[in-house]
């Protein structure tokens, strides 16, 4: 299957907050999104982690 699951981890505190899926064939690079981190209590950059 082309769709693969991964977690999004906060860049500042390294806490894994979100689970998502993406098409690995279309999007090869790692995903980076601004999301809310409950540990930091603010919006921070989250990066894809396996």
Curated annotation (Swiss-Prot):
> What GO annotations for molecular function exist for this entry?
structural constituent of ribosome
Q: Which domain of life is it from?
A: Bacteria
Q: Which keywords does UniProt give here?
A: Ribonucleoprotein, Ribosomal protein
S-S bridge residues: none
What the entry lists under InterPro entries is as follows: Ribosomal_bL33 (IPR001705), Ribosomal_bL33_sf (IPR038584), Ribosomal_zn-bd (IPR011332)
Gene3D superfamilies annotated for this entry? Ribosomal protein L33 (2.20.28.120)
Q: Which residues form a coiled coil?
A: none
Please provide, in alphabetical order, the Gene Ontology terms of the cellular component aspect for this entry.
cytoplasm; ribonucleoprotein complex; ribosome
**Which family is annotated?**
Belongs to the bacterial ribosomal protein bL33 family.
Which NCBIfam families does this UniProt record tie to the protein? Answer: PRK00504.1 (NF001764), PRK00595.1 (NF001860), rpmG_bact (TIGR01023)
What is the protein name stated in its UniProt record?
Answer: Large ribosomal subunit protein bL33A
Species per Swiss-Prot/TrEMBL record = Mycoplasmopsis pulmonis (strain UAB CTIP) (Mycoplasma pulmonis)
């Amino acid at each position: 299957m082309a769709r693969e699951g991964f977690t999004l981890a906060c860049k500042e505190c390294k806490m894994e907050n979100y689970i998502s899926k993406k098409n690995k064939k279309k999007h090869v690079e790692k995903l980076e999104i601004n999301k809310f981190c409950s540990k930091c209590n603010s919006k921070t950059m989250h990066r894809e982690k396996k």
